[in-house]
Each structure stands twice: as structure tokens, then as C-alpha cells.
């Protein structure tokens, strides 16, 4: 099927940020009294907006994260991005193929607009995502796994949900795409396929993604 809109998740799909973010999140949660391993951070928090991380910690421990947690965490993440962040291998070629084929695309991310902007600048993807192509959980009332973000992106881009495909690497994102009535392509580089239940198709390499999108 040829889609009228491709909605990319950002972290882990466009920019290789999940290892950086989850390493720092695990370290910082441990530092403030909530021991967390890298593996646990990937399992429990990958794909989450910050408010969901706060809610999960409160639910599990009965304690709130300290005031200023988000600001400190984002400062550490942005500093690490400047040193380490790269685009996901092969994604530039995917985007170039979409541009050449005239297929509309955008990004729908749990991250803040600032996080998306910094990541794209450092990774050299900002040339692909200009005005009107970037949508954040900040833009809607509920983040993933609610469908609001993807539905909002589709509405702003003028495309019916049933003509959209979502590219995701987290269980929360897959659930959001399915709830929005969209096909979902699950990226298995960091998440086992069995955790991406609901995805229409899976891919392990960006080269496979080109075939799934443009076939």
C-alpha cells in the first residue's frame, strides 16, 4: 500500500538517542533514590513523555521526583547529544527516497519541541524537518499510548488516519498508532518484535523500511 503520510517517531527511529537518554535516565533516577538499571529504563520508560515517567515513579514508590528533575535531566541529555548523537544508520537515505518520491512525512514524538530541534540539528536532520513537519506530545493533552499525537499530526497535514503509516520502535508508540487507526511499522533494532505487538509489519534495517514504504 502506498501511504499519503508517513509519521516517524523521533527517538530511536530518526536519531539514535535511546541509548544516550536511557543511560542518563537510569543514572539520574538512581542518583535521586530510585535505583534503575539501563535495561529497566529501556523496558519501562522508552517512548514515554516526561509526565508519564513522573506518574510511573509515583505509582511504584509513592514518592514524587524532585522539583527541577526535568530541567536537570534535559540539560544532561542535550550536553550528551552534542558529544554523541548521530542519525539512525540509513535513515538519511530513507528520507531522501521519500523526498524524491514526493511522499509527505512528518515526525510525531513524545519528546519536547526543544529536544527534537536539538537532536535534529546535531544529527543533521533539520534539513528534512522544516516548519509544519514536527509534532510533539507538548501539542496535545495526552501523549502515547493515547492516539492524540498521531491524530493531531494527520489533521495538521491534511491526511485521513487510514491513509497514514506510523514508524515506531516502542510498545507505547505502536499502541498509539493502532489506536489512531493507522498502520504501524515496528523497528526492532532496540525492541524485540514480541514487544511491538500490533504493528502491521516489522523491520530491522532502514533498507527494509524503504521497501515497506515505497515497495
Predicted segments, located by residue:
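Asp-based, Mg2+/Mn2+-dependent phosphohydrolase catalytic module
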Residues: 1-4, 96, 112-215
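N-terminal helical cap/lid subdomain that shapes the substrate entry/recognition surface
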Residues: 2-101, 117
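A generic short-segment signal for beta-strand/edge and adjacent turn/coil regions
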Residues: 11, 21-23, 41, 73-76, ...
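Conserved phosphate-coupling serine/threonine residues in phosphotransfer and NTP-handling enzymes
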Residues: 13, 109-111
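A generic secondary-structure micro-motif detector
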Residues: 15, 43, 84, 106, ...
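Residue-level detector of anion-binding/catalytic polar loops
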Residues: 35, 104, 183
Amino acid at each position: 500500500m502506498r501511504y499519503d503520510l508517513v509519521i516517524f517517531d523521533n527517538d530511536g527511529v530518526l536519531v539514535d538517542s535511546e541509548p544516550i537518554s536511557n543511560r542518563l535516565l537510569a543514572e539520574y533516577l538512581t542518583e535521586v533514590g530510585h535505583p534503575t538499571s539501563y535495561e529497566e529504563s529501556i523496558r519501562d520508560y522508552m517512548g514515554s513523555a516526561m509526565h508519564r515517567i513522573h506518574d510511573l515513579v509515583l505509582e511504584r514508590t509513592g514518592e514524587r521526583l524532585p522539583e527541577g528533575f526535568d530541567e536537570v535531566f534535559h540539560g544532561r541529555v542535550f550536553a550528551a547529544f552534542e558529544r554523541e548523537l548521530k542519525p539512525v544508520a540509513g535513515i538519511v537515505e530513507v528520507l531522501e527516497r521519500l523526498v524524491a518520491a514526493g511522499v509527505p512525512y512528518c515526525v510525531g514524538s513524545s519528546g519536547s519541541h526543544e529536544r527534537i530541534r536539538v537532536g535534529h540539528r546535531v544529527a543533521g536532520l533539520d534539513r528534512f524537518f522544516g516548519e509544519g513537519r514536527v509534532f510533539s506530545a507538548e501539542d496535545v493533552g495526552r501523549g502515547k499510548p493515547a492516539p492524540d499525537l498521531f491524530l493531531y499530526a494527520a489533521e495538521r497535514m491534511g491526511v485521513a488516519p487510514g491513509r497514514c503509516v506510523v514508524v515506531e520502535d516502542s510498545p507505547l508508540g505502536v499502541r498509539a498508532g493502532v489506536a489512531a487507526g493507522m498502520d504501524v511499522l515496528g523497528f526492532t533494532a532496540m525492541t524485540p518484535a514480541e514487544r511491538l505487538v500490533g504493528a502491521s509489519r516489522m523491520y530491522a534495517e532502514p533498507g527494509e523500511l524503504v521497501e515497506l514504504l515505497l515497495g
